[in-house]
Amino acid sequence: MNGVVIPQTPIAVDFWSLRRAGSARLFFLTHMHCDHTVGLSSTWARPLYCSPITACLLHRRLQVSKHWIRALEVGESHVLPLDEIGQETMTVTLIDANHCPGSVMFLFEGYFGTILYTGDFRYTPSMLKEPALILGKQIHTLYLDNTNCNPALVLPSRQEATQQIVQLIRQFPQHNIKIGLYSLGKESLLEQLALEFRTWVVLSPQRLELVQLLGLADVFTVEEEAGRIHAVDHTEICHSAMLQWNQSHPTIAIFPTSRKVRSPHPSIYTVPYSDHSSYSELRAFVAALRPCQVVPIVHQKPCGEFFQDSLSPRLAMPLIPHSVQQYMSSSSRKTNVLWQLERRLKRPRTQGVVFESPEEKANQVKVDRDSKKHKKENLSPWAGHLERLCPHPLQARKQLFPDFCRKERDEPVLFCDSNKMATVLTAPLEFSVQLQPIDEFLFPETREKIGLESPLLSRGDSGSPARGNQSDCVGCGSPPAHISRAVPLTPESRGLALKYLLTPVHFLQAGFSSRNFDKQVEKHQRVQRSSPAVLSPVDVG
C-alpha cells in the first residue's frame, strides 16, 4: 500500500487502515489506481478529499457514499478546518499530477509548515509554473514518487514512447492491434493512436464509460469489428490468447509500460511508455523545489541519497509545540467519535425481540400439564358445579373470577391462564372463608351465556363483602343466607392445589408439597366430622 499518515499532523494520504491511522482525521486520495485504494470500500465513513474526476470514479467503482466524498477543484486553494470548532485550519492546493485521469498532487500548508505530496506523477516543466509553486514556495517536506528512481533505468518521454508505438503499428498494416492496459490510465494514448491511423478504438463498456466522462474525442466504440485497435486488460494478453486471435486474424499485442515484461509470444511487444517520472525528471524536479527533506512514497525503494545535493541548506524544519500536537490529537479523537455517532444514526435501527420469562413459561407449562392430567379424577363438587355451568373450566374461571382479589391480599401473581394477571387467595383449611358472591360480578349477557337464570348466591344485607372472623366460622348455629355449607371432601379431591392453585406455586416448590396439602385435607375432614364448618367458594383472580 502506497500511503502514509504524515507525522505530527492529522493528515492521511492514500491510507485507509483506520486501526493504524492513529489521530488522522483528514483523508486524501491522489488517484484511483488499486495500489492506492487498499482498504477503501463502500463501508468507508469518513470525509474523503479528492479531485472531481476521482470523486466520480470512487462512487461508481467502489460504491463509496457521496455523503463522505469531498471533491476539490484542481488548481485552487482550499481552507480546511483541523478541529471541530475551526480554531485551527490549513490550506490544501490540488495540482495536476499528469499520471492518470483525476490524479493530483496535494500541497498542504499549516502549522506544520509546507508539505508537497506528489502521489504517482509524471514530471513536466510546466508543473513549476503552477501558481502554488511559482511564488518561490519553500517546501519543508517533499513526499516523492520514486517508482522509477533508478539511475540505470533510462526512460523516454511519453511523446517519444508514443512515436515508438506508432512506428511499430505501421510495420503491421494488416494486423489487429491489442493494447494491454490497466483499469485506468493511457486513455490519451488511445486517442492519439485513433487519430493517427483514422480508426475506431474498441473498448469494453466500462472503459467507454470512463472516456466519455473525460470528454475525449469521439473515436471509441464497443463494436468488435469496428476498428483494428483494441484496448484490453493487460491480463488478457497471454500465449493462448495470441494463438486464438491469430487463428481468426493476424494480431500483435503491445504493452506500453516501463516494467519488465517477459514476452510469452513473439508477437507481443513492450514499449517503455510510463506514467511515472524517470530518474532524470525526478532530479530536475527536486532541484527546482529544493525542499528541506525528501520522503519516498514507495517504501521498498529508498532514494534519499540521490537528492542530498538538491536539498535546501538554509531551510529548517518547523518546530511544532508539544501543546499543539496534544491539542490536535485530542480534537481528532473527539471528531472521530462524532463521525462514528453520525454513522450509527444513519444505520437502520435493529428491531428488538421481546422474549417471555423462562421461569414464568416453565411454571405455566408444568401447571397446565398437571391440570390436564388430573382433570377427571380431582374435581371437587364446587369445581364440578362450575363445569356444569360452562363446559370449559378455563373459560368459566376467566368469566367468573375478576381481578378484585388483588385489593384484598396484594399477593404477587404466580400463574394465570388468561392474559390478564390475577392474584390467588389462600387460607388455612381449618377455617371457613367468607367471600363475596361470585354471581354479582357477572354481566347479564355473561350470566345468560353460561346458563344462570338467578344469582348463585344472594347478597344479603351486608353492603360490601368482607372476610368472616375465624371465631364465627366454627360452631356457628345457622349460617347467613349468603354463606353455603361446605360439602364433605372425598379422597378424589386430592391434587386440587395443582389444578386450581388454591396454594401459590412457590409454596409448593418451597416444600409445601401436594402430600402436605393432602394431609391438610384429611385434617379438614376430621374437623368437619367433629364440628361441621362453613366453606364458601374461594375467589381466584
Curated annotation (Swiss-Prot):
Its EC number is 3.1.-.-, 3.5.2.6. It catalyses: a beta-lactam + H2O = a substituted beta-amino acid. The keyword DNA damage applies. The keyword RNA-binding does not apply. GO terms for molecular function: 5'-3' exonuclease activity; beta-lactamase activity; protein homodimerization activity; protein-containing complex binding. PANTHER family: 5' EXONUCLEASE APOLLO, DNA CROSS-LINK REPAIR PROTEIN PSO2/SNM1-RELATED. 5'-3' exonuclease that plays a central role in telomere maintenance and protection during S-phase. Participates in the protection of telomeres against non-homologous end-joining (NHEJ)-mediated repair, thereby ensuring that telomeres do not fuse. This is 5' exonuclease Apollo. The lineage of its organism: Eukaryota, Metazoa, Chordata, Craniata, Vertebrata.
